[in-house]
């Protein structure tokens, strides 16, 4: 396949909004300036449109490019998806040409599985952080990729808090987070009649497809109509090393406009 559908952040620049989306173009621009942007890559808006042309399927050529750029990300970061010794975790985010805040989908902590959670707990010496990240990933992936009810996951959390006699999520300890992981997986299996995916590359492709699909979810369609944004633009997808906001009291994440 001659057409380029995937760009490392340092390959693009801020003028390429039509192809890389607003987020991807700005990440590229900041990378070019030498700012400390966590490594990642952008799957273009053209890949999104091709996905719809191919009956909502990511074709083999685009998949091959995604895997090629994942390999580059792993080499740059020194981490690998699913690695038992030094695992890579990524975020998968939408990025349309025009800002559409909250309209499309995001998946965080992708790459988590049973083995990786144990490794992260050991590497950080922080079991609570590791299993909190894992349960958040299961919850988000189940909702965004598989369409399960967000409400039921929140109810499960409330049930565990009630059993423990606490009211704040911050008071849930590492053992509570481990219990939530198992309860979330059980709900997933009961609803979908299959196990939660352990293979990080399967997780990644599922998440990318979900972001492409979110371009045409009802709230995104409504937002585009209200703001005169053409449906033909499509959305880019940004895959980037995770930055954690839940590792402790000395870290956080936010959005600046």
Which residue stretches match the model-derived regions?
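Nucleotide/phosphate-binding sheet-loop regions of phosphoryl- and nucleotidyl-transfer enzymes
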Residues: 1-257
């Amino acid at each position: 396949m001659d057409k380029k559908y995937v760009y490392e952040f340092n390959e693009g620049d801020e003028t390429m909004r039509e192809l890389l989306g607003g987020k991807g173009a700005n990440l590229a621009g900041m990378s070019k300036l030498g700012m400390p942007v966590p490594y990642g890559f952008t799957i273009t808006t053209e890949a999104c449109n091709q996905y719809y042309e191919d009956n909502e399927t990511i074709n083999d050529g685009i998949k091959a490019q995604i895997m090629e750029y994942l390999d580059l990300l792993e080499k740059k970061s020194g981490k690998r998806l699913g690695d038992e010794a030094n695992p890579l975790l990524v975020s998968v985010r939408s990025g349309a040409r025009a800002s559409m805040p909250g309209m499309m989908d995001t998946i965080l902590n992708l790459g988590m599985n049973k083995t990786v959670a144990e490794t992260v707990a050991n590497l950080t010496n922080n079991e609570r952080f590791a299993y909190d990240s894992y349960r958040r990933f299961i919850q988000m992936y189940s909702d965004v990729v598989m369409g399960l009810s967000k409400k039921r996951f929140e109810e499960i959390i409330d049930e565990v808090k009630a059993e423990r006699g606490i009211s704040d999520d911050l008071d849930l300890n590492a053992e509570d987070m481990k219990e939530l992981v198992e309860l979330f997986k059980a709900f997933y299996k009961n609803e979908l009649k299959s196990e939660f995916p352990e293979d990080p590359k399967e997780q990644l492709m599922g998440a990318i497809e979900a972001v492409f699909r979110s371009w045409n979810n009802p709230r995104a369609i409504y937002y585009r109509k209200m703001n005169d944004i053409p449906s033909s633009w499509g959305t880019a997808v940004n895959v980037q090393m995770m930055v954690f906001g839940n590792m402790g009291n000395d870290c956080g994440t936010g959005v600046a406009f």
